[in-house]
């Protein structure tokens, strides 16, 4: 009788395994297909193996779905199932593990999202950034004309494309990449950008030598320098396969979440990719912040992770992360309920931003306005892109776009458009400085608008002329005295030589 019972049990088990496809051979096939598909997915999509990344959960869901689809095919349960109920029963028998994984991933994702929610963690979001207060006239020094960056990004791109067009040995094979990172290089505000391959065929022709040069655009003199490299850049965002920068990073740092890499050069002119490491400070998915950066040599591919960023690096914290963190700070200082009702002391950043070079670093500048979203600012912030040191300056005045409209109104007969302003200290007066462009995007004039009294606007064909006119207008309105109204002689002489 015992043998009969054992035999019956084995028959039932074999029958279930046959019906459900739960056999060693089928499982092996399912696993092989899933592993191959997973490797292809990982190679193409490059998800970080990190619980704080949504892409990681998508990767696991993809693997589970592939396994289930393969199991349905290899087991033949789609032929055996008489109805939906039977199909689901057989599917559970073949895919119990991946189905559990899908359920677990869903639960973790939902719970993690709730624990990261600003609704219940508003206080933590408000503490992501530390904001100090500063004095504008003491902290922001007047800078000489040869330090004022007159080029915006669009103008720099036009100059870069024009320069490449002059190089007969490069223009047929390469294009200018659209990085144009603003940095301080040897005490000068410049934008730097590498070349990229014109297309896949030009990549095939030139990949062994790499990208031969990068461009430096001086934002003051508007000069473009093509820096030819003794050895080409082999690791860039324009590369393919293992030399693609994103793939190179992922296989070297599989658990790191990276922000968008930026192209920079050190003081010797060696090209690097600065790859900020993203961490989540709040729950699983909330409180995006930066914790160090990986520096990748664009020529050799050598990389190193730094928690203490070298001083020559300028861009670690992106403007978007800085503005998001300040918006959390300004919005949730009084709690989540206050951000919706009452909105006492609730402030947010304005829509635009710009960069200011100071003390061999690059700072993000943006205005701060009240939650009412009127056309005036209550002040502005400056944030060091390398250290995230943030200072708020309480200066009530015109919002940047209002200042742009004021400048455009002065030259409305010419139909010029204003660039997003740069904040300067002119005679201890916070002043918006901007270029005025024609319909073709060429800079034709310059304008200065007083932040606190944006009806005070002056323009000029040159920066020197613009500032001279602006100082005279400040004098005529009793804002400054005659001593401050004069442009320093050494600066006047400098620009006359130019």
Regions found by a protein language model. Give the residues of each.
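Single conserved hydrophobic/aromatic residue that forms the stacking wall/gate
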Residues: 1-14
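Soluble extracytoplasmic regions of secretory-pathway and membrane proteins
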Residues: 20-498
């Amino acid at each position: 009788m015992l043998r009969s019972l054992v035999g019956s049990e084995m028959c039932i088990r074999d029958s279930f395994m046959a019906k459900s496809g739960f056999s060693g051979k089928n499982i092996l096939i399912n696993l092989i297909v899933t592993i191959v598909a997973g490797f292809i997915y990982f190679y193409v999509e490059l998800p970080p193996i990190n619980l704080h990344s949504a892409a990681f959960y998508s990767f696991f869901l993809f693997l589970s779905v592939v396994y289930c689809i393969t199991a349905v095919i290899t087991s033949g349960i789609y032929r055996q199932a008489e109805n939906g109920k039977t199909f689901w029963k057989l599917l559970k028998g073949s895919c119990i593990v991946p189905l559990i994984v899908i359920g677990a991933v869903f639960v973790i994702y939902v719970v993690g999202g709730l624990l990261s929610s600003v609704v219940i963690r508003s206080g933590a979001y408000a503490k992501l950034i530390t904001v100090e207060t500063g004095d504008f006239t003491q902290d922001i020094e007047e800078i000489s004309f040869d330090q004022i960056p007159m080029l915006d990004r669009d103008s720099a791109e036009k100059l870069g494309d024009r320069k490449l067009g002059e190089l007969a040995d490069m223009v047929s094979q390469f294009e200018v990449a659209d990085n144009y990172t603003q940095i301080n290089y040897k005490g000068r505000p410049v934008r730097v950008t590498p070349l990229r391959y014109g297309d896949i065929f030009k990549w095939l022709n030139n990949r062994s030598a790499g990208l031969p040069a990068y461009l430096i655009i001086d934002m003051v003199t508007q000069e473009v320098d093509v820096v030819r490299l003794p050895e080409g850049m082999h690791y860039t965002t324009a590369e393919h396969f293992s030399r693609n920068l994103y793939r190179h990073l992922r296989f070297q740092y599989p658990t790191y979440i990276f922000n968008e890499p930026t192209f920079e050069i050190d003081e010797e002119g060696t090209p690097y990719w600065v790859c900020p490491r993203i961490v989540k400070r709040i729950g699983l998915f909330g409180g995006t912040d930066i914790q160090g950066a990986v520096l990748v040599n664009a020529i050799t591919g050598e990389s190193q992770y730094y928690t203490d960023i070298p001083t020559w690096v300028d861009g670690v914290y992106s403007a978007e992360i800085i503005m998001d963190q300040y918006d959390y700070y300004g919005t949730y200082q009084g709690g989540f309920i206050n951000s919706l009702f009452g909105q006492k002391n609730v402030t947010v950043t304005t829509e635009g931003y710009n960069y200011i070079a100071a003390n061999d670093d690059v700072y993000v500048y943006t205005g701060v306005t009240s939650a009412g979203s009127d056309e005036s600012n209550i002040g502005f912030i400056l944030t060091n892109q390398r250290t995230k040191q943030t200072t708020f300056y309480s200066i009530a005045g015109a919002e940047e776009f209002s200042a742009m409209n004021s400048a455009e109104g002065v030259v409305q007969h010419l139909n010029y458009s204003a660039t997003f302003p740069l904040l300067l200290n002119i005679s201890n007066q916070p002043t918006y400085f901007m270029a005025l462009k024609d319909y073709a995007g060429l800079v034709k004039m310059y304008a200065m608008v007083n932040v606190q009294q944006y009806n005070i606007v002056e323009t000029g064909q040159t920066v020197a002329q613009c500032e001279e006119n602006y100082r005279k207008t400040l004098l005529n309105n009793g804002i400054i005295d005659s001593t401050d109204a004069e442009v320093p002689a050494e600066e006047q002489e400098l620009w006359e030589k130019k």
